[in-house]
């Protein structure tokens, strides 16, 4: 065996092992690997030098020694690589970990608008009383908003100072933004003659008015109950039950006052005294006028019914002590943060 080459190999082994052990990063280790095991590395040069040895026995023995060294260095490099990778991971975990003791970023959660809350609550109360929720169009013809509801052409509600009329007619009919959801009652009675009819219609309505207690657009829910032998006592029970449930006060003071609406006879306005306040009007109601039944093809000698209309904004203002109706539509986040509700409040 060529003694000089053998001594050189043994000396190289000590040097390579030391460099592998002292490598402080994966980049340094890769340089060591290329230096010894790469295509232009020392081990490759040793194998090339074997070609110059003529003695086959010496060539074979030196080749085995070089192979052993190559395998040893390869194993040492793999082992060192695993160690360095583990150290790198630990370093990242220590320096990039989230400190859970720090205060979390404030989370902004949206809130349910008071009108959405009240609408949902009102419909739920009436649903428990057997009323079915129905919908209708916001843009209506005069027949469904006024004529069918026994509102004559000279009635003040039909004047342009109170009602929004559209410029263009549809099928030669004058169109309006509905002033109440009673138009949905008319459409329902036109479509079905299956009794009892027991519905509530909630939605946007429009009137030409704007101040602290009025807005051009607001929300109403109107109810209708039609069957044989419907009476005023049933109407009063329905109103009492609803108001007691909504305000959560079984001792709520409620009074009915005689009034006039063209679509009901007799008619009444309902006042409440809430939390010791003075009497406040909350809704209008009455027994459905026979002319309304005639206009939709229902025999008023056999069937009768009652109807009521409630302003959603009015209920919300009373229950949550909101003084200005216009604040519902100002889109102020600070206002909604104060008066809004968590989504879980919707039942």
Curated annotation (Swiss-Prot):
GO terms for cellular component: cytoplasm. This is Phenylalanine--tRNA ligase alpha subunit. One of its GO terms (biological process) is phenylalanyl-tRNA aminoacylation. SUPFAM superfamilies: Class II aaRS and biotin synthetases, tRNA-binding arm. Its cofactor is Mg(2+). The gene is pheS. Its main location: cytoplasm. It catalyses: tRNA(Phe) + L-phenylalanine + ATP = L-phenylalanyl-tRNA(Phe) + AMP + diphosphate + H(+). It is found in: Cytoplasm. Pfam families: Phe_tRNA-synt_N, tRNA-synt_2d. GO terms for molecular function: ATP binding; magnesium ion binding; phenylalanine-tRNA ligase activity; tRNA binding. Tetramer of two alpha and two beta subunits. Mg(2+) binds at residue 265. Its EC number is 6.1.1.20. Binds 2 magnesium ions per tetramer. Keywords: Aminoacyl-tRNA synthetase, ATP-binding, Cytoplasm, Ligase, Magnesium, Metal-binding, Nucleotide-binding, Protein biosynthesis. Belongs to the class-II aminoacyl-tRNA synthetase family. Phe-tRNA synthetase alpha subunit type 1 subfamily.
